[in-house]
Amino acid sequence: MKKLLSTFVMVYIAATAFAQTVSFTSPNAESQKMLDSVKYVLPEFSAGMVIFNNGEQSNGALNINTIDQKLHFIDPSGKILVLSNNDQVARAFIKGRSFINSRYGYIEIYETSGEIFMGEVRKVGFISEDKQGAFGSKSQTTSIQTISSIQAGNGYMIDFEKQKNSPYTYKKTPYLCRKGIVQPVTKKVFIKCFPDKKEAIEKYISENDPNLNNVQEVREMFRAISK
């Protein structure tokens, strides 16, 4: 049964919200321009579909925020909203791209082999020696958030006006998944995913010395091993 996304319980968030890791420790005009370009996974909100754990589906103009790792969408009035029941989302398809919801965030699927898939999570995080001072005091749970702030996963409120010139990191992290179990990429995890190809995995690593934190190198290894 399909429903409009606007029929679900939602909360307002900022339209201008915000792991290989790129760090910007001295904010400047260029780093802030970069931040604007990576605060969402896709460059623009696009037609997509959400599939929930119970099998229900919803359609709308969607995108994925790289700070809160939640689906955002545009309602009929043009407001940017965040889906409050993101924990009930199983998958999302946006502009021909496929995403799996996991405890690590939304994983964009790049490679598949039967029940195994490989993908990446993109995340933006602020750098601070004192998170309490940078993010402010812990917030109370609320059904509606102000248009200038958003609650980070650590329970702190981020005020965009105060944080827009803060140092930050932009991180792309590869993941592997088998039988619904998602894990960061390691040699051991590769072998768990392809137990019958242990020798091939060890040989590939010995000959190519891939950086298992690099999305493209993991993708190439996945293709080679899954042949």
Predicted regions and their residues:
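Sec-dependent signal peptide cleavage junction
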Residues: 19-41
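A short, solvent-exposed beta-edge/loop patch
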Residues: 156-213, 217-220, 227
